[in-house]
Amino acid sequence: LGMINLYYSEAYWGHSATMNGPHKVVKNLLMSLDQEKVDYAINEEKYKFNFLLQYDWTGHLKHSELDLEHCIIGPQIWMFDEHVKDLKENPSYYKSLVTPSQWVKDLYVSKFGFSENKISNWPVGIETFNNERDITYDCLIYFKRREQKELDAVKQFLDSKNLTYKMVEYGGYGEDGFKNLVNQAKFCFLINGTESQGIAVQEIMSMGVPIIAWDIKEWLDQGEAYRVPATSIPYWDERCGEVFFNIDELEETFTKFYATINEYDPKGFIEDNLSFKKTVEKLMEIFNAD
């Protein structure tokens, strides 16, 4: 298939005791390359393709030593870093940047002036779990970077329906505890900020748990000047569950969702779009593109 040099530093995620996004990207990438039998080297230039996963200052210095023709960079790029200007001003320094999803690509193009044809969407692969669901309660609430009053409204709603729930807050769980909680839930209620990929949410899908998502429409993390259309579920289709945006749509959306709760197939969605096989193929396409 091809052979890749991966560049990353564990210090990039070392501040975090629990699993986090940047660490998970590397972990899942290694697992997917192993599964698909793609040879790789770590932090040495041994093969033709260079994949620089983190473009912090260390990554920036590393970049200056690499063969650039077959170099792709991302998904960990912070657009507000001074050294990122180098990438914009010198598109010949890399084959492509990678973004985890379309809205992030749109952000780079519309707000930071990057050329559309120098950016490729590449989500990291999601494990396809062979779990037997063991349902012991109704709803797992996944709550991250949203307002307390929104969480309270959802809890009140679930109480009014006599549905039991447990809550998982971002950063507050180990991986095994998280998987057990997910596997025991009948469904998941997602109250989430914007996600560039949403790996934890996709793991919930991959375990076959349907989701009702209270989505949002914009990225406002850096204020008005950088406002762009965005979402908490960048990878989604009707097999995954139901979506609403305003609290007054909750009752109607939930009624529909709950009536067809056994007809969703989130696991099938992951297998078709985000499996290790599919995402490694996508990565090799980016490297091999003309």
Language model segments and positions:
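A short hydrophobic beta-strand element within the catalytic core of glycosyltransferases
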Residues: C188-F189
